[in-house]
C-alpha cells in the first residue's frame, strides 16, 4: 500500500469519525484529536481538513431539516409569530459562543487542545450528563435507577421548539460556550444545558441541531478564512474524501439520534464518555 493511499484511508476514517460524533454528546473534536494522534494523521493543512469535514457534517443536518429550515426562513420573513420567535431564540443562543469565540478561541486552542484535557472533560461531561438525567427523571419516592428510559421529562416546561422561551435559549447559548474546550461536546453542552433549563430531551436535541447550523457554519467559515493559506494541492483529495465521509455518516447518525432520543436517555453516552476518558488517561500515562 502506497503512502498516498494510506493517507486517503486515514482521511476517510477521520471523516467517518467526524460524522458519527458531531451530533451525539461525545465530542467530535476530542475524538478527532485522539484518533488523529493514534493513527498518526499528519497533514500540512490539518486545520483546513478539520474545518471542511465539519462542513460535511453541518450540510448533512441542513439537508435532513431542509423542509423545516425553509419553513422557518419563510415564516420569519413573512412575520409568522411562532417562526419569528424561534429565529430570535436561535440568534440569542448563537450570540454567546460567537462573542466568546471571537475573543478567546485562539487562546483556547493553544491551551486546551491536548489529549490530557480531552480525557478530563470526557469524564466530567459524562458525570454531569448522569446527574442531569437522574435529576430530570427522579421524583420523590423513586428508588435509585427506577426511572423509565421511555418516560417523558415531567419537569420540562418546553416540550416543543415553539415553547422554548428566550431565557431558555440564552441558557443553551451560554452552555454552548463550554464546548470550545475539546472533549466537552457542542451537542452535549447544548442538549444538557437545554434540559437543565427545562427543555424536554427530544426538543433540546432538535434545538441543538438547529443551533449547530449558524454556529458551525460561522465557526467553520471563520477558521477556513484564517487558515486558507495552509491549503496545499497535495491535500485536496484527502479533504474531499473526508468531506464526503463526514456528510454520509452524519446523515445516518442524525436520523438515528432523533429516533433514539424519543425513547431513551443519554445515560449510555455518559458511561461511554467516562470509560473513554479513563482509557485515554491510562494511555497517556504509558506514553
From Swiss-Prot:
Per the record, the domain of life is: Bacteria
Which BP terms from GO are recorded?
cell wall organization; peptidoglycan biosynthetic process; regulation of cell shape; response to antibiotic
Catalyzes what?
Answer: di-trans,octa-cis-undecaprenyl diphosphate + H2O = di-trans,octa-cis-undecaprenyl phosphate + phosphate + H(+)
Query: Which organism does this sequence originate in?
Result: Bordetella petrii (strain ATCC BAA-461 / DSM 12804 / CCUG 43448)
How this chain sits in the membrane, per its record, is:
Multi-pass membrane protein
Q: Where in the cell is it found?
A: Cell inner membrane
Q: Where are the transmembrane segments?
A: 6-26, 45-65, 85-105, 111-131, 204-224, 238-258, 265-285
Which gene name belongs to this protein? uppP
**Lipid biosynthesis among the record's keywords?**
no
InterPro entries in the record, alphabetically?
UppP
What GO terms are given for molecular function? Answer: undecaprenyl-diphosphatase activity
Gene Ontology CC entries for this record:
plasma membrane
The protein depicted here goes by the name: Undecaprenyl-diphosphatase
Stated EC number for the protein is: 3.6.1.27
The similarity annotation says:
Belongs to the UppP family.
Q: What is its main location?
A: membrane
Keyword list, A-Z: Antibiotic resistance, Cell inner membrane, Cell membrane, Cell shape, Cell wall biogenesis/degradation, Hydrolase, Membrane, Peptidoglycan synthesis, Transmembrane, Transmembrane helix
Q: What task does this protein carry out?
A: Catalyzes the dephosphorylation of undecaprenyl diphosphate (UPP). Confers resistance to bacitracin.
Q: What else is known?
A: Bacitracin is thought to be involved in the inhibition of peptidoglycan synthesis by sequestering undecaprenyl diphosphate, thereby reducing the pool of lipid carrier available.
- NCBIfam families reported in the protein's UniProt record: PRK00281.1-2, PRK00281.1-4
Amino acid at each position: 500500500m502506497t503512502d498516498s493511499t494510506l493517507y486517503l484511508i486515514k482521511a476517510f476514517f477521520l471523516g467517518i469519525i467526524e460524522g458519527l460524533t458531531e451530533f451525539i454528546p461525545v465530542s467530535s473534536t476530542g475524538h478527532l484529536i485522539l484518533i488523529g494522534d493514534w493513527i498518526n494523521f499528519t497533514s500540512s493543512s490539518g486545520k483546513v481538513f478539520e474545518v471542511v469535514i465539519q462542513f460535511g457534517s453541518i450540510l448533512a443536518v441542513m439537508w435532513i431539516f431542509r423542509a423545516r429550515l425553509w419553513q422557518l426562513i419563510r415564516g420569519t420573513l413573512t412575520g409568522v409569530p411562532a417562526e419569528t420567535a424561534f429565529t430570535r431564540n436561535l440568534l440569542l443562543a448563537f450570540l454567546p459562543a460567537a462573542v466568546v469565540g471571537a475573543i478567546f478561541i485562539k487562546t483556547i486552542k493553544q491551551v486546551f487542545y491536548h489529549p490530557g484535557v480531552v480525557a478530563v472533560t470526557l469524564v466530567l461531561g459524562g458525570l454531569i450528563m448522569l446527574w442531569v438525567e437522574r435529576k430530570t427523571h427522579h421524583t420523590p419516592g423513586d428508588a435509585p435507577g427506577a426511572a423509565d428510559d421511555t418516560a417523558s421529562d415531567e419537569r420540562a416546561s418546553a416540550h416543543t421548539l415553539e415553547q422554548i422561551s428566550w431565557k431558555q435559549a440564552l441558557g443553551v447559548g451560554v452552555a454552548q460556550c463550554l464546548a470550545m474546550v475539546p472533549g466537552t461536546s457542542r451537542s452535549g453542552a447544548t442538549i444538557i444545558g437545554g434540559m437543565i433549563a427545562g427543555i424536554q430531551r427530544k426538543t433540546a436535541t432538535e434545538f441543538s441541531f438547529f443551533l449547530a447550523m449558524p454556529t458551525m457554519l460561522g465557526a467553520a467559515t471563520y477558521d477556513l478564512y484564517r487558515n486558507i493559506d495552509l491549503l496545499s494541492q497535495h491535500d485536496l483529495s484527502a479533504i474531499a474524501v473526508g468531506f464526503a465521509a463526514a456528510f454520509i455518516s452524519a446523515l445516518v447518525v442524525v436520523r438515528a439520534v432523533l429516533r433514539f432520543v424519543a425513547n431513551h436517555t443519554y445515560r449510555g453516552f455518559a458511561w461511554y464518555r467516562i470509560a473513554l476518558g479513563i482509557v485515554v488517561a491510562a494511555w497517556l500515562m504509558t506514553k
